[in-house]
């Protein structure tokens, strides 16, 4: 049993901040700097070369990423962002999709089967919580970090949709997941079949309440 061999809750808290990328093994001191360099390379080099992004919009893409990091929760208003950044609404959606393909962001839709080419996502997360801590130091909302981890882990081999009124996420069109801390109760998912709570301050499964760190075993 995992809990007999280590302290998963304590280790999980460390992992949310540092642990996603293997270059952590080269030393913790430069870990966040390496992440920033990686993101800048994607934005400044790969997007213009591969996706033909206008280099004059690079700073706007950087600002868009910063917005995703800082807003809690980040539910997309593409028209508002387009107006603020002085670019087209479709361009905003296009850039988000590029960043999703580059594994900088995870884009969630309330109904993935009906997503069109220029459909805006309902909710946007950084691809993993380490990006939050690297790009928005001192401002990370723990709820956002939890959800970012959950989406990142589940998306490897499952379909994840924005839950809207029923839970945080709908998984594979069947399961309803609510993400939270130790005190999270069943009020938002009461009476919903195949619904579960994943809590980060939780050691072992208790009925339909499961440790959030267990999702890390999915990949």
PLM region descriptions:
Residues 97, 103-219:
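A cross-kingdom feature that marks ATP-driven nucleic-acid transaction machinery
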Residues 1-133:
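Interdomain hinge/linker elements that couple catalytic modules in large macromolecular machines
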């Amino acid at each position: 049993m995992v809990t007999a061999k280590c302290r998963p809750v304590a280790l999980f808290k460390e992992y949310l901040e540092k642990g996603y990328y293997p270059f952590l093994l080269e030393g913790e001191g430069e870990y966040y700097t390496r992440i920033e360099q990686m993101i800048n390379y994607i934005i400044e080099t790969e997007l213009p070369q591969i996706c033909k992004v206008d280099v004059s919009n690079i700073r706007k893409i950087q600002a868009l990423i910063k917005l995703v990091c800082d807003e809690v929760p980040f539910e997309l208003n593409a028209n508002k962002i387009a107006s603020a950044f002085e670019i087209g609404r479709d361009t905003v959606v296009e850039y988000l999709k590029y960043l999703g393909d580059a594994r900088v962001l995870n884009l969630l839709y309330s109904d993935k089967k009906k997503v069109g080419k220029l459909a805006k996502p309902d909710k946007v997360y950084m691809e993993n919580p380490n990006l939050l801590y690297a790009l928005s130091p001192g401002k990370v909302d723990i709820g956002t970090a939890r959800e970012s981890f959950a989406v990142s882990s589940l998306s490897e081999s499952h379909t994840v949709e924005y839950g809207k009124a029923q839970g945080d996420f709908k998984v594979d069109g069947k399961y309803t997941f609510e993400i939270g801390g130790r005190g999270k109760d069943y009020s938002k998912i009461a009476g919903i079949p195949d619904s579960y709570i994943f809590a980060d301050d939780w050691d072992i499964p208790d009925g339909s309440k499961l440790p959030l760190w267990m999702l890390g075993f999915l990949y």
